[in-house]
Amino acid sequence: MTNPLRIQQLMKLVDLTRLTDQDDADAMQLWLDKDLAGAAVLPAAVCVYPAYLAQVKSFLQQGQYAVKLATVVNFPTGTLPLAEVLEQIQHARASGADEIDCVLPYQALLSGQTEQVRQFLAAVRQASAGLSLKVIIESGELVTCQQISKATELVVESGADFVKTSTGKVKVGVTEEAARIMLAVIAASDRPVGFKASGGVRSVEFALRLVGLFEELTGNLATPDAMRLGASALLNDLSQQLDY
C-alpha cells in the first residue's frame, strides 16, 4: 500500500480537469460538488474551458477553496491566429483565471518554423504577465526525441512557468519517455521551470511513476509550484486510496 503522505502529496499536484466538449453549466456544477467539494485533499487547480471560468470562480470564492483557476487557449490544435490567442488570454484574465494552459503551435515547429514559434511564445508570455503560464507541447504528436527536446527548450527559453506534455485530445498523451526528455531539459535550465504531465494520467501507479521521474531527474521534491498532474478522475481515485 502506498504511503498515505505520498498519496496526499500527489493530490496536491493535481490540476482537476474538465474539458468535455459536450457540457453545460448544470453538469459542471454537479462535477464541482462531487469531485472538488468531496475531495479529501484539495488539488492545486481546477482547469476548465473559458466558458465556465465565471461559474467556477464563483464556486471557489463561495466555498473559500484555496485552489487556482486554470483555463486553456489555442486549444486543442494549436493553430489559432496569434491575435485570437491573445484575445483568449485577455478574456481569461478578465474572467478570473490564475493560470493559462496554452497549446504550442507544434505543427509550425514540425514544419521548421522555429522563429515563428519563438515569436508566438514571446507574445503569449507578455500577454499572460502576472498569470502562471503552462505551455503544452503535444509531445505525442512530435515525431522524434529531438523535436520533444527542442519544443521544451523553446518553452523554457520563453519564460513560461511550466512545460506541459499533452492536451489529452490526441491519440498519444504523456509517456515516460517523453517525460524523461522534457525533464532533462528542465533540469538543465538556469531558472526554475515546472513540469505538467497530462493526457492519460489515469492510474495512481502511473502518477507515482511520473512523480518519481520528476524527483529523480530534477533532484527536487514534487510540489505544486514545480509539478502538476492534469487529470479528470485521478483525484477521486487518490481519495479512495486514503479511505482504505
Give the predicted meaning of each segment:
Residues 2-41, 51-195, 204-232, 240-244:
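Alpha/beta enzyme core
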Residues 237:
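N-terminal beta-loop-helix "entrance" segment that forms/cooperates
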Residues 201:
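Short donor-sugar binding/catalytic loops of nucleotide-sugar-dependent glycosyltransferases
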